[in-house]
Amino acid sequence: NMHHFEYHNGKLQCEDVPIETIAGEVGTPFYCYSHATLTRHFNAFDEAFADVDHLTCFSVKSCSNIAILSLFASLGSGMDIVSGGELYRALKAGVPAEKIVFSGVGKTTEEIMYALESDILMFNLESPQEMLALNECAARLGRQAPMAIRVNPDVDARTHPYISTGLKENKFGIDLEIAESMYAQAREMSNLDIVGVGCHIGSQLTEVSPFLDTLKRLKLLIESLRKEDIQVKYLDLGGGLGITYSEEDPPHPTEYARALLE
């Protein structure tokens, strides 16, 4: 059991505090989060990758409550953001900018400028147009923008079609074939600093194999980039492992890490 929500004598409790008691104090409706559960989950991931230089990031879009973001910040978590508002919240919550990755489609010029001025870790780019926009914004500020391209590895995540993002027919990310030429273009742009390769193959993944397929394909890409003398520092692997809604049996983070590190 990975969480701290339990029934005692038919009454739901969170970390041994009856939900009824909380309702009596704060009124209903309310959200009740268990810090102990979130801490345990974060540590499970973070410790699983202890043997390699890594950054475990929380997806801010999944819960942008500043109290929760502050908890993760105190644990040393990074943040994966998809908007200027999420960047504002992450910084407000005490997350260092060098632990923030800006993903997502449709980043506005204002958001890009704000993220550049904040000195975030990197931008995950989703299109050639976005690459031009990032280069332009960085030129305006006279700096190098750290970037990765979100590659679509054409892997079936075997998840629900509504939340699958890594197949060729899915609209997200850049096809592997195109990614290489995009990296070559990026290298010619004066205000881009190529630092990574990213991907996000879906949500609610309950098997390790789609991640392994993805990793194999991204390794090939990284190797051919190295031949072109493009040195990639970061490999951004997404999305997260699934959770047990009913019958699912997702792998434990340690199994996930072991498989990837092998």
Regions found by a protein language model. Name each.
Residues N1-A145, M189-D193, L220, K227-I230:
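A charged N-terminal "starter" segment
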Residues G24-Y31, E117-F123, P161-I174, E207-F211, ...:
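Glycine-rich tight-turn/loop motif centered on a GG-T
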Residues H41, N152, L176-D193, L218-V232, ...:
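Structured alpha-helical segments in the cores of large, soluble enzyme domains
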Residues S59, P146-N152, G198-H200, D236-G238:
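Short beta-strand segments
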Residues N65-I68, E86-Y88, T109-E111, P153-K168, ...:
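Conserved radical SAM core fold
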Residues S118, S127-D193:
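Conserved anion-binding
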Residues S203-E262:
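C-terminal active-site-proximal or functional interface alpha/beta core segments in diverse enzymes
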